[in-house]
Amino acid sequence: MRLSKEFIGLGIITASLIFGSSLPDIYKGIVILIVAGCLWFFELLPLPVTSLAIPIMAVFLGIFNLKEALTYFAHPIIFLFLGGFMLAQALKNHNLDKFIAYKLLNYGKDFKTTCFLMFLSAYFLSMWISNTSATLILLPIALGLLHKKTGKLRDFLLLGVAYSASIGGIATIIGSPPNAIASSYLDYGFFSWFKVGFPISLLLFLICTLTLYIYFKKWIPKEDIAIQARMELSRNAYKLLVIFVLIASLWIISDYLSEIFNVQYFDSVIAIFAIILLFVFNLVEVNDFKKIDWGTLILFGGALCLGGVIVKSGANTFLSEKLIAILGNLTPIVLLFLVVTITIILTNFISNTGLTGIIVPILFGVSLGIPKEILILAVGMSASCSFILPVGTPPNAIVYSEGVKKEEMMKIGMILSILSAAVITLYSILYL
């Protein structure tokens, strides 16, 4: 009888508990790291389920007690994401996300300009809502603009939307879970991340757009075309717009507010305040909590817990020493480029949240002639650069399902991956 992959995953977890119980703590941490990495990579269990298995393994192997293990699932940054998800749900409920996209697209004069504005819409929306939602919002508009056209033009427009949505997530701490994982090790707030994340995301967005235009130049029509879409906002939508601007403004100055009120993770306080405001003004309902992406929050908590396991068991120090022995002779810029490149390659095969949760704790304990802050920020930013495969990220999968050729995605994706690795490396060395 053929075993299902879920039973194989369960068997691996059980075996790790049986054979790992007699090992020293360092090796217990490495066992949990390997098991979690394998389960995430091969998706033997759903990603959130693997994340829930991490604290259980940590408890049974004696690294944490249950209270310590589950604390990571109530980390303040989890609540920052919860607030961001609820704000995104409110935008969806009242069509404010579509309104923002349509407003931008109305400025298009010809096909080229309209496409750029569509990419810009995906980039901007992805700072505040998931890259999946940003792609799905713009997909019907993009398909309508194509008028059943196929081939290179379809690849150009749809890949531009998908890649822009992924890159936009780098800009803010709530844009992508890897940002928050990296921030949790650096005690970064919303504005601290925005200061470093927005410039590199904007640069990558412009490079991505330029690369797509150059690659597909001869297939882009020159005829005039414009989207004249009108949307009327409801009274509640205007209320939401005010709250959205207020919360975004508070997040931007959250580091200063944290100092004034002497409260750590003040951006998480703002996120909780945002949820309360949304309910007070009847912009969301209790049922909207059911629509939140709880799987991502659990995955995020599991990644944080894995990081805690690696640090407490001493596995990060052990692995760091091995890393130094292998890479210690490389120059800092070559080493940084190598770390960024490996992250970008792996993020095409494994969840970027899980990947960041594995790499960051190891780098946190290493000394390779590069400040830890630069290494961790570079990994956090690189984890969102998944351009090569349809399975790499939901936006890639969405546009692939709409007819984008895998060969074109791989060609453009490889070019963008190389450019992204070089740009992030130089940015990290020169700017950070």
Curated annotation (Swiss-Prot):
It is a multi-pass membrane protein. Keywords: Cell membrane, Membrane, Transmembrane, Transmembrane helix, Transport. It is found in: Cell membrane. The chain crosses the membrane at residues 7-27, 29-49, 68-88, 124-144, 156-176, 196-216, 241-261, 266-286, 291-311, 326-346, 358-378, 379-399, 412-432. This is Uncharacterized transporter MJ0672. Its main location: membrane. Pfam families: CitMHS (PF03600). It comes from Methanocaldococcus jannaschii (strain ATCC 43067 / DSM 2661 / JAL-1 / JCM 10045 / NBRC 100440). One of its GO terms (molecular function) is transmembrane transporter activity. CDD domains: SLC13_permease (cd01115). GO terms for biological process: transmembrane transport. Belongs to the CitM (TC 2.A.11) transporter family. It comes from the Archaea. GO terms for cellular component: plasma membrane.
